[in-house]
């Protein structure tokens, strides 16, 4: 519509008058249609909740029938498939990826034969304290029955995995534990990873090797098929979405629709939903706000493994919702985040235990925690920015410095650093002006005096920082931290040059842990907590296993529990159907 000059002036005058009235009226609100209310929110559907039209039967080019159809060839999917096939089950795996995939490598286990061999006293009774600490951290919102199944069958499942992997030439090692000086989140060596001579870094790259080995066992030894590059699109639930889930329709790389009929059950193991913007906004809103500029909601790569900008689009979760599955009860879905204040870490999953400051030059917490809790604290800071300060003597606060990838007996050849080597690494980083980690980079400084160091530290209140360092040194000399009460055993003064500092911003996003409502037998349930006949899920999309955050207090819990033990048990349970 076009306006002449007179109409334009009339409209402008009316708008000005309206604005004036609105400005004077303290209760004035925007147009009612723009105001969200609880009633409107309840009546609104998210994009992912709206089911697509059913794929017509005449578009289906092939029907393939098996007793069990497992959707997804990540760690959980192939573990479930092998466990079921070993029991004689007729299994097929359908996956969007071009190979079996996974990421990381740490499998937390309780009471394995490998731990017993190494003299590590860790069994369900010993683990009671750390389990209670973890469940308390999750405010008891998680499903404790799932936890009990994991804890009580952890040794059984990891021993099974060790035997399978070693049978194919892989080696197992144990990563160091986390020695909390306060004994609150103290955990012994419990993270098992698998490595080869060609790839000794099992803590970071062991999971892909493990998943591909499961796939090899499934196809070569057990005679089952994996259909790669085949994306599941819809579940088929009988009786107008009130009966049994009997099939899944998938699309192959040529665009053909294939109907996979499951005579007994379908298992969803499709990973997380961190590449779906709406699902992140709806189910993990805090993580969404923190990382929305980092996450990639446009690109889809079903072969993705180690990445920090999102993983999967939530295919399995959506398909479940479309046929009547309920969402998990725990809210929000727990994000997996790490990357605390940077600096020399007493263990690879430690926050920097020395002096941490914010942009105001002030301390903000008891620094002695792990790198996940350290990251959470950093994300709450102004500009999400933390500074760390220490002196050269800090290198001698322990005899050796664990490197990421080390095993407790150094079997894989990755050696810890000596104090002299760690100092050399600080000098190298300071010379470069930065320290590049696995997923993030920190600004690095070095100076001969504290005053010179602080002068180099950009973005911080320098005067306040000097006061804070002075006060911290007094606490260290007196053996009493009067602010945050750091354990005096790890309270070290900053007094002998050269001096070092880092500046780190934000945190590292890995994934989100949760999805469809799932009981302890891994059955997908409806809003009334009733199992949906014929439908299971497993892996990271398992609902209600985690709460608040995945905090790495039991490092390797995700691969060890939902992708390992619970998937193993599901495979064995399927054989009883």
Set out the residue ranges of the language-model regions:
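An anion/pyrophosphate-binding glycine-rich loop and adjacent beta-alpha core
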Residues: 313, 317, 323-457
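N-terminal glycine-rich dinucleotide-binding loop that anchors FAD/FMN and/or NAD(P) in oxidoreductases
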Residues: 105-132
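A glycine-rich dinucleotide-binding beta-alpha-beta segment and adjacent secondary-structure elements
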Residues: 464-549, 553
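Glycine-rich loop(s) and the adjacent beta-strand/alpha-helix scaffold that form part
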Residues: 255-256, 261-338, 556, 560, ...
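Extreme N-terminal leader/targeting segments of oxidoreductases
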Residues: 2, 7-67
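Rossmann-like flavin
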Residues: 125-189, 445-452, 456, 461-465, ...
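Glycine-rich FAD pyrophosphate-binding loop
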Residues: 86-103
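Conserved redox-cofactor binding core of oxidoreductases
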Residues: 149-256, 277-278, 476-496, 501
